[in-house]
């Protein structure tokens, strides 16, 4: 089920993702799927804080729940509203919109059918204006519609598509957004604006291994980008067996090519490997997106990068980086979780993507599971450990202190919150102050990266008025 609420549309240049008020500063969306709403545990909520020249502006923030006026449904225990987030200017009105997954939502179709809700951007930010809702697809009992979300443009026609996983069916589906004529001035009717695009199933066999039933497979992550370099976004779709750890032949990712017809072609790459986090970015500047996967179950954890090419990706050319790689500070230890979270952005404005890597279970200053985050830099030869940087709550200039079980690094983003063309770092620590959580903003220094710390700001549950509600801020970050 997908519900959409839209204000009137007007002719404007599309906004960057997560720029909800169209001012050029990228904003931060934080999901709290386990958050308590009233007496409803795990109902979930989403907190938004707006960007500014100085970074995250604590004076401008908002919390959305399914009890917020204008949002469909009602906050119920276990809905997990905010489990997944994705953003694009769906109606191309100059303000980014936000898609929110609630995979635990019970519907008429059954328990845990799941829903996806879109909140619309305006000059004043995200809105919950009342309007008509729309339902698409056929989520059923335990389908967990919306467990993962991604946005791309497989047609390259300027209209983004929204991709939604339906793990209970081992599939994902996508929808086109068709904005109304700018001259109409009428409110968008979501039933006419959102069009089903199609569905794809994941491969469930390798060699002689028999296909599994849909109930035995969990579609886990989605990412988009032009991996093949043909000008169309491709979809990278990762899955794992419902049992964990999954056998080697029952986990991995596929690359599905986009086309001008708006359809996804057959997989150009099928890679069987561990995937615990997923991102795409052009790390070597060749105008093809590379696929990065976090493999945090390895000793200490690692990140594997598969370079893009006209024929997809090739496992033989992958690069693996961990805490023991040349140039990476520190050393890996069992259970550190390097690669639990990853995010792509251009920190130094050199035209090559860089990668933030969360290591939330690293021991810091003698504090077990305090956590840290790393930044790895792109180069002409691809992602490298050379010049890598790490930050924690023990880093000079960072508010607070590294404490046991903070899990600093459980979530990471690289987005340009200050509108200077350089990606800033946000690190989530969902176990800060118990289960309140916090996020810490680091302003990019350009070629110098993030060290020494230039401008940093920590934002906790008190800022949003959600103390004591199991917010776990920083566990889910819009990226």
Please state what every model-predicted region is:
Residues 12-26, 31, 82-95, 146-156, ...:
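Beta-propeller blade termini
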Residues 31, 77-91, 95-105, 110-121, ...:
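Mobile, glycine-rich extracellular loop/lid and propeptide segments
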Residues 34-39, 104-109, 168-171, 240-246, ...:
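Short glycine/acidic-enriched loop and turn motifs that connect beta-strands
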Residues 1-16, 50-80, 120-144, 176-217, ...:
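Blade-edge motifs of beta-propeller repeat domains
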Residues 218-311:
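Long, internal scaffold/assembly segments composed of regular secondary structure
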Residues 44-46, 59, 114-116, 170-172, ...:
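Repetitive beta-architecture junctions, highlighting loop-to-beta-strand starts
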Residues 22-31, 92-103, 156-165, 229-238, ...:
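Acidic/hydrophobic-patterned starts of short beta strands in beta-sheet-rich repeat architectures
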Residues 28-30, 46-49, 64, 81, ...:
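Hydrophobic strand positions within the blades of repeat-based beta-sheet folds
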């Amino acid at each position: 089920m997908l519900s959409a609420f839209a204000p009137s549309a007007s002719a404007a240049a599309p906004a960057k993702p997560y720029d909800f008020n169209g001012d050029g500063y990228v904003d931060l969306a934080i999901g709290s799927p386990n958050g308590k709403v009233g007496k409803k545990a795990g109902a979930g909520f989403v907190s938004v804080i707006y960007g500014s020249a100085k970074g995250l502006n604590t004076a401008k923030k908002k919390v959305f729940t399914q009890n917020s006026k204008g949002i469909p449904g009602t906050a119920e225990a276990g809905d997990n509203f905010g489990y997944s987030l994705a953003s694009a200017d769906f109606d191309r009105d100059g303000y980014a919109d936000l898609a929110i997954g609630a995979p635990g939502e019970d519907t008429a179709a059954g328990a845990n059918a799941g829903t996806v809700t879109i909140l619309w951007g305006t000059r004043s930010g995200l809105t919950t204006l009342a309007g008509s809702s729309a339902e698409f697809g056929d989520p059923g009992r335990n389908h967990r519609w919306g467990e993962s979300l991604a946005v791309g443009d497989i047609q390259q026609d300027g209209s983004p598509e929204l991709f939604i996983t339906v793990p209970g069916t081992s599939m994902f589906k996508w929808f086109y957004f068709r904005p109304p004529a700018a001259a109409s001035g009428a409110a968008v009717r979501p039933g006419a604006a959102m069009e089903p695009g199609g569905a794809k199933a994941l491969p469930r066999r390798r060699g002689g291994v028999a296909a599994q039933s849909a109930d035995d497979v969990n579609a886990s992550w989605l990412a988009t980008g032009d991996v093949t370099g043909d000008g169309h976004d491709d979809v990278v779709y990762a899955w794992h067996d419902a049992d964990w750890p999954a056998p080697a032949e029952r986990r991995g990712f596929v690359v599905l090519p986009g086309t001008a017809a708006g359809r996804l072609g057959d997989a150009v790459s099928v890679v069987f490997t561990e995937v615990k986090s997923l991102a795409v970015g052009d790390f070597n500047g060749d105008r093809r997106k590379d696929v990065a996967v976090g493999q945090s179950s390895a000793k200490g954890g690692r990140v594997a990068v598969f370079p893009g090419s006209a024929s997809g990706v090739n496992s033989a050319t992958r690069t693996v980086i961990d805490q023991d790689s040349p140039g990476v500070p520190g050393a890996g230890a069992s259970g550190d979780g390097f690669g639990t979270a990853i995010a792509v952005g251009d920190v130094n404005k050199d035209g090559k993507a860089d990668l933030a890597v969360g290591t939330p279970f690293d021991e810091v200053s003698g504090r077990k599971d305090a956590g840290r985050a790393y930044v790895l830099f792109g180069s002409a030869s691809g992602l490298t450990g050379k010049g890598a940087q790490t930050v924690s709550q023990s880093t000079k200039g960072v508010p607070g202190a590294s404490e046991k079980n903070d899990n600093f690094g459980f979530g990471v983003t690289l987005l340009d919150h200050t509108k200077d063309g350089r990606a800033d770092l946000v690190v989530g620590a969902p176990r800060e102050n118990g289960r309140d959580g916090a996020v810490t903003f680091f302003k990019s220094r350009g070629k110098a990266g993030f060290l020494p710390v230039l401008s940093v700001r920590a934002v906790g549950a008190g800022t949003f008025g959600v103390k004591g509600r199991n917010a776990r801020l920083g566990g889910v970050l819009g990226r």
